[in-house]
Amino acid sequence: MKKHLLILLSILFSFKIAAQTEPVYSTDGNETWYYIQFQNGGAVLEDMGDNAKLLTKAAAKTDNQLWKVVGTKTSCTITSKNGRSIYYEGGRFGTSSTKKATLNLYSTTNASYKPAWEIQQEAGQSMNQWGGAGINKELGQWSANDVNNPLLFVSPKDIEIRGEEPKILKEYAYSSVGTKFAPEEMLTLWYKDPVTASTVTNPWMEFALPIGNGQFGGMIYGGIHQDRVQFNDKTLWTGSNKIRGAYQNFGCLYLENLDSIFSTETTLKGVKNYYRSLNLQNATGEVNYASPDLAIKYKKEYITSYPDQCIAIRLTASENGKINQKFYMYNPNGKETVYEDGAGVYYGKFQLVSYYAKMKVIPIGGTMTTDDTGITVKEADEVMIILAGGTNFNPAQLSYIDDASTLASKITERVDNAAKKTWTEIYDAHVKDYQAFFNRSKLTIEGAENTYDTKALVDRYNNTSINRTGKEPSSLMLELLYYNYGRYLLISSSRGVELPANLQGIWNNSANPPWQSDIHSNINVQMNYWPAESTNLSELHKPFLNYIYNMAIVHDEWKTYAKNSGQTKGWTCYTQNNIFGHSDFMENYVIANAWYCTHLWQHYRYTLDKDFLKNVAFPVMKSCTEYWMERLIQDRRVKDGTWVCPDEWSPEHGPGKEDATAHSQQLTWDLFNNTLHAIEALGDDAGVTPEFVTSLKDKFKNLDTGLHTEIVDGKTLLREWKYSSYSAGERRHRHMSHLICLYPGSQLSGTNEYFQPAVNSLLDRGDASTGWSMGWKINLWARALDGAHAHKILKAALKHSTSYGTDQSQGGIYYNLFDSHAPFQIDGNFGACSGVAEMLLQSHTDTIQILPALPPVWVKGSAVGLRTTNNFEVDQYWDNGKAEYAVIHSGSGATCAIKYPNIDKAIVKDASDNEVSATVVNSNTITFPTKAGEKYTVHINDPVGIGTVSANNSSFKIEVQGNKVMILGNGFEKVDIVEANGAKIATMSKASFELPNTNGKVYILSIHKQGNKMVESAKISF
């Protein structure tokens, strides 16, 4: 019967009461009690005590949340069951036993929430969830009909009581692994303490470790006594296409240790040899520890599988029958978990989406029992837990949702299918799937060593007495980890549903995260995808690109915003966006559409995928171009005849509205330039009229480029505003919106007259800033071809941040290597990752620039598998700060152009070791033809040539090309060839020969001359 009841309940997903009538007014001896529940977010009012501020809370069984209304609709008082009445003072509502306010119940006209009520203390001003919807909000006053005003009077029998959050258990006493420990895999984050032992105010943000399959993911706490996996799904949002809402915490899975051999009080019964880790090479979290006597070793493994669409956890021990655990879940958004037959389920509904989560416990050996509090396993050999969750969100539906009645069966099927498999089957499929992306590219920095735990790496990096030169093994290791972590996070947060990674990727433990963890269009979501193409993760760009297509072409909201701005064609969006097409904040910032289009074009430039260009990118770009061709006006201030963007904003400072901001003009330049190139690439498939092309070219020809200068303190800077002066903004502002032309755009190169003013502006902006801002600056300094300064910013970006609230002076990282704005924002992780790639390889000019901004501290290393425009993949090797050789993999057979100092002397060979004829453009640039699917080795300083030639005024000249050696001069007889260690290679009677295995070798040549006993020597170093 319980199972049938669960199935029936699981399709209801009821969040709000459908109808709302006027509350019954209480009188003496006839009292009616209500929960007062806000429509947006579902929180209820709670009496916090005498003369205390009123707060919003999750509904619970407490008299503090029960209220009676006395009087009439237009003149009433509201009093809690504890006898305290609502009053208004000092800009906030509170409760008091001696004070009360005369209130009015106003019937809201908010279209999203009516029928509902608003509580007013004065006409036109309503009680409002201050700072956004959610729990723990103070109540202020705001204009009537705001989305955070409407509320319902809900009978106690109808309220949805949320499950009680599990009591947090004190961590066991423990000791960590010794100082000689090092992880097996170099690319591993590892720690000596469980998150559950931390005393910081936000251990989730500081220490928990992320896992994810692109859409569904979790944060691992690594606890021993009571472990926790907080989990998310990218589609779990409050709000709708009319209400911003916020990204939500899906809930928590708890694993409680029932072993009696451990104790919280004494190290005699404490855990031994504890450590937890996140292996970036196989996307696996682990917790390892031993029993107090070291006899039993325990391990927990955590993955989020893309093939099986679930979080999978395995618990093992070195002896059978030693796993004793209890498993339970917590739903922070609604109903309690229902447990049955080794499984747990909870579900609910927000304004638009319904959600469903299920976990299943699969023990091997031992016993398993289930009751209303969870699932208990005793004396098992091994336990596997499968956890899945999702919503009925569907971006292909105009309503954004599917029928909720099928959601439970979809998630249940997902869990059951995974539960039928062995751990090995699930794990092997996960690793194979993940490594197909991660292993495409590898960065090596010689000297890096992972011999300190990651917290210690961060501390050592920030200790100037330790990190003195930047070449210390621990310093190099942190930089190497941080780059690879960026690629790991992108794989883990950008697959599956056609939605981009948001401000926090997919990881969020709050009902009201900073900036709602939204899709922020004025830098943040774009930065999330900067490393996608260059670090060889092109497919992971697609969720963002397809999101743009869906919003711009399939759905209507963004087209409506275009009409609202006065245009009849095209689409646009504003600064803050949810997943349902809703967009708001700074509604004159409409240039975001052009910025989005640069991503569509970049994907084509890197892949040369004509189908994508024709069917996805170009329709969006053309529509956006039509919008701007219609919106542009001729300059109305200086009247120079140029076309300018009206009433724009340079995020997030300076004039709130001004024509021709550098930011908007540069992005429009990019849009028009890229659209013309797209038309050329598509030919007739572009489907545009000659009149359209002519009009576009005319607008482009006379477009203000956004490149203007001004003199500040004797230096020529790029202007941020065409009209307003430098002083209109903040000198050290975090946004560098007027430098789009330098990065991520490609309007400027080193030969452009505006290049140096742009660099001067960058220098003037300063170094330290928010985390994401420093991520941007790494890329900008790389484009400025200054590797030392780019590395200086990277070093600042790796400063440990000590703030978990909004604090723009606390940019850096947390100990889990999450980027800190502060607080956590994932864009900084991706910006730094992209910045490292830009230091090592650039191709925005369609010329591959080898090591354009190599930091001096990265003396020797390799970068394998980075990608460039024109569908090339490049492997680079360097030593002593100089490129030795590069391997070019041609994906489409385009002509390859390469730039590096004195590359005109390089030798190019194909895979068969045949020399390829290269055209010398200048001493620093060559080009050569390629064939699709072929690879080419460019020997730059490989070999470096003759080291020394000695012997009485040598009569021979030696030339080296590749591994070919030619001895020129009269009287040659033979040459003896030995390695530097004395090993003889050969004696050659010909003056032209090839040397084997040249990379890194040193050969000594002893040249014999006819009729002369003298031997002349030469040394050749490769």
Predicted regions and their residues:
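Bacterial Sec-dependent N-terminal signal peptides
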Residues: 1-21
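Lectin-like carbohydrate-binding module/patch detector with strong preference for beta-trefoil
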Residues: 20-171
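Aromatic-residue-lined binding/catalytic grooves and analogous aromatic/hydrophobic interfacial grooves
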Residues: 168-585, 597, 602-604, 622-626, ...
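Short, glycine-anchored, charge-dense loop/turn motifs used at functional sites
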Residues: 486, 978-984, 1003
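C-terminal catalytic domain of Rieske-type non-heme iron oxygenases
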Residues: 505, 509-510, 522, 643-647, ...
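Acidic/histidine-rich catalytic neighborhood
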Residues: 623-681
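C-terminal tail/sorting-segment detector
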Residues: 944-950, 1000-1022
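Glycine-centered coil/turn sites that cap beta-strands in beta-rich domains
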Residues: 947-976, 992-1000
